[in-house]
Every structure is written in C-alpha cells, then in structure tokens.
Amino acid sequence: FMAMAQFQLIDGDSKQQSNSVYNLPTGSIQSPTADGLISGMSTGAGQWRSIYMTFSAHYAFKSRYIADFSVRRDGTTKFGDNKRWGTFPALSFRWNVVDEPWMKGAQKWLSMLSVRPGWGRVGSQPGAEYLFFSKYTATDSYNGANSIYPSNIRLSNLQWEEKETWNVGFDLGLFDNRVTADFNIYTQMTSKLLMTNVNIPSSSGFPSLSWTNVGKMRNNGWEFNINGTDVVKVGKFRLGFNVTFANNKNEIVEMEPTALANLNKDFDNNNGSYLTRVQLNNPFGAIYGFRYKGVYQYSDYSEVEVPGVSGPN
C-alpha cells in the first residue's frame, strides 16, 4: 500500500501595451519612440491564482489485483466566489490475469494479460481573468465630455467544464513482450461546456458573452494498438511495427439555442469549401453537402419524351 499527497500554488500575471501612430515616414517602423502623431494608447494587466491539492492511494495484492484512487481539489480566481472550487476524483483497477496460478502453463509464451476498468473526472477553466467582475470603460465621446460606461456582463455563475470518462482496457503481451497489444473502450461525457464569444440578444445592451457554459457533449469509441519489437532480426538489422486502429462517435446532447445560433452561420460557404453545422443529437461540426447518386448520364434526360415538346411530331 502506498499513499501520497501534493499541494501546489500557481500565481500568474500578464501585461500588455499598445500605441497607434500615424504620419510615419514608412510603415516598417515599429519603435514607439519614433517621430509621429499618436492617435491612441492603451495598457492592460491581469493577474490570477490557482491552487490544487491531490491525494492518491495505490494498493496491490500479490501483484495480481491492483487498485488506484485519487482525488483532486482545484480552486482558481477565474471563477466567482460561489463557483471557484472543483473536485475531481478518479478510480481504477487492474487484474493481471497472467499471474494467476491456473495460467502457469501459458506463461512460457504469454507474458502479459490484464483487464483494467477505470473512471475519472477532470475539469477545465476559461482562459481569461476577472470574468466575475463588472468592468467599466472611460470615454470622451459623449457630447465631448468624459464618461464611463459598463463594458461587460458580470459572469458570476460561470462554472468548471467537467469531463467524466468510463473506460475498460485489455493488455496482451506475447513472447517476452516482443509483441504487445492493448484494446480500450471508452465513453466520455463533457458537461458545462465552456464557449467563448457567444452572441446574445442586443436588448441586453451587449453583443456577446465572453465566456459561458453552453451544454453537454458525448464521445464513445474504441482504440486498438499492436506493437512489435525486433520481430525480424538478421545480424544488426532489426524490424518492428506499430499499428493503431481507432473509432470515435461524437454527439451533441444539449446546447443553448444562443450557442447553436452562434456556431451555425448562414448558408453562404464559398465554392470549394465545406459547410459545417452543429445540431443536437449529431456530431459536432458535421459536414453538409450533396448526396452522391452516381455519374450523370446524358441519356438520363435525352430519351425522355414530353408530349407537345419532344418526341416524334
């Protein structure tokens, strides 16, 4: 049995500055001290902190039955006070079938055979700071006088995006692991999907939300890998191989209507490009196009007779 605890505190900050200048002798000048007329200047700064604590435990019985458990507690200043913390556990098991007493007869050629089910949850956070604050912008464009106006909607209910995964895996090794293979089946549900720049009704006074939780998405699939090491050995020549097969099915389970409208633009795609749509119960970004019915034949319409228009007179 083994247990371990970890703790980490992360402090991040960002700063930016921009100048707009005109009447420069050439457009290749980039120095902010160059002789020119300044039309605008802006600065910005951001700061955020995150903290996480983890606890993990590992237990093995006779090297045949193995269990792992972990839990992670995350907190970040990118969310409001009531949504700042997230808890993300994980649990997995492993049964080394090849080490069972009744498998001794096969151990001469079977070096590994195991089954490993697992479950876990992880979280994602937005890539911006101060989303839960009301911010204001100073301007002098109101009747020539200085003024202040709100520049964002306070996102106090923004939450962690969560991905919950169930999986079952199988491992196989042959001839002292010269040939190995693994097969995994999984299902993953992503809830509270984070999306940026989602358009909202103009009656709110703002064109869009910088970040919001919009819905759920499911992924089901499988993956098969097979590897060979030194399968062919001739002198100093060695030959191995690595082959992978995989299949994934994606489905939008839930999504806010405003997010769907934001993702699905007008049917105005350019010639030669694909039109993609996001719809409930369909894959994310499904490609739309004409259905193929075969090669067009001239005789498909040349032999059709229309009374009074074509055919014998």
Which sequence ranges carry the predicted segments?
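Extracytoplasmic gating/loop element in the C-terminal half of outer-membrane beta-barrel translocons
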Residues: L37, T76, Q297-S302, G308-N313
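Extracellular/periplasmic, surface-exposed regions of secreted and cell-surface proteins
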Residues: F1-L280, G285-I287, R291
